[in-house]
Amino acid sequence: MLLGLAAMELKVWVDGIQRVVCGVSEQTTCQEVVIALAQAIGQTGRFVLVQRLREKERQLLPQECPVGAQATCGQFASDVQFVLRRTGPSLAGRPSSDSCPPPERCLIRASLPVKPRAALGCEPRKTLTPEPAPSLSRPGPAAPVTPTPGCCTDLRGLELRVQRNAEELGHEAFWEQELRREQAREREGQARLQALSAATAEHAARLQALDAQARALEAELQLAAEAPGPPSPMASATERLHQDLAVQERQSAEVQGSLALVSRALEAAERALQAQAQELEELNRELRQCNLQQFIQQTGAALPPPPRPDRGPPGTQGPLPPAREESLLGAPSESHAGAQPRPRGGPHDAELLEVAAAPAPEWCPLAAQPQAL
């Protein structure tokens, strides 16, 4: 069943035949559509309009609008089909349900409008004209039908009876639908409760197993701490490496300390050698001066002084001034030239000249005798 909104016509499947109900608007209810179709097929009884979308079916209430119900499907509105089903014979023997109050509406359907019942003395409503239309083209305007005077009363009674039947059927379907919904919710709740109970039991069992495992691990750790076993090869190797590193560090520290001591001792030895060299040099210088003085004294004692008429008394002769080591080791002429000048004709001029003219072989053995002294 497809709905053409532009043509304002509703397609309903009745006993496997597609029929088109013209003049349908957004305010047209399911009750009006059912009455029109029942009059068109000429059958009496209880009917219900079913909305089918793919594999799902839903019974429409008498006051629902098929156009609005189809519009709520959105993009699947073109897949919606309406089917008219006959649920049973008409309730001719039952008392009129005009005096019976309508059933209470639950909160889910409380917003649906309730249409007032038509009075018996009111004018007959405008009937809808269902016509079978296998094609999608809109039919042309139908010719007006003139009802006969004798059939008006019968038609009016039939309409009222069909209306009551549709209302009762709509209420029954509504309560059946609500019952099915509540039963489905109850089944869902029970299934969820069972699933939660099973999950709770499973988690409790897992918690107990984990608790037992944790206690076992704690006991093992306590036993391992109280009675340590043989160390693992990795731990022993690591410990040996740490010990070797500590020994090497101590050895390096000792070597560095010994190197520092050796360097300080070497510096002290160098200073001592320098001091000894200086002392030896001073001793050599003093020894040479002593040798020079001894040589001068020996040479002066061996050579008699020449007789001079102007020489003073022997007791007035002063000591011989020592000559410098460097000038004596060098040329005798330089030593004589570097000596302090004395006045010519002094008492020691002849002796100084004789010492300066002495041969060199006699000086060398004396200068080379520091150990004999």
Swiss-Prot record:
PTM note: Polyubiquitinated and degraded by the proteasome upon prolonged stress stimuli.
Keywords noted in UniProt: Apoptosis, Coiled coil, Cytoplasm, Cytoskeleton, Ubl conjugation
One Gene Ontology CC term in the entry: centriolar satellite
Coiled coil: 175-227, 248-297
Positions of the UniProt region annotated as Disordered: 122-150, 300-356
Location in or out of the cell: Cytoplasm, Cytoskeleton, Microtubule organizing center, Centrosome
Residues annotated as domain Ras-associating: 6-89
Chief site of localization: cytoplasm
Superkingdom of source: Eukaryota
Keyword Kinase: no
One GO biological process term: apoptotic process
Function: Negatively regulates stress-induced JNK activation and apoptosis by promoting MAP2K7 phosphorylation and inhibiting its ability to activate JNK. Following prolonged stress, anti-apoptotic effect stops because of degradation of RASSF7 protein via the ubiquitin-proteasome pathway. Required for the activation of AURKB and chromosomal congression during mitosis where it stimulates microtubule polymerization.
Oligomeric and partner information: Interacts with MAP2K7 and GTP-bound NRAS.
Protein name: Ras association domain-containing protein 7
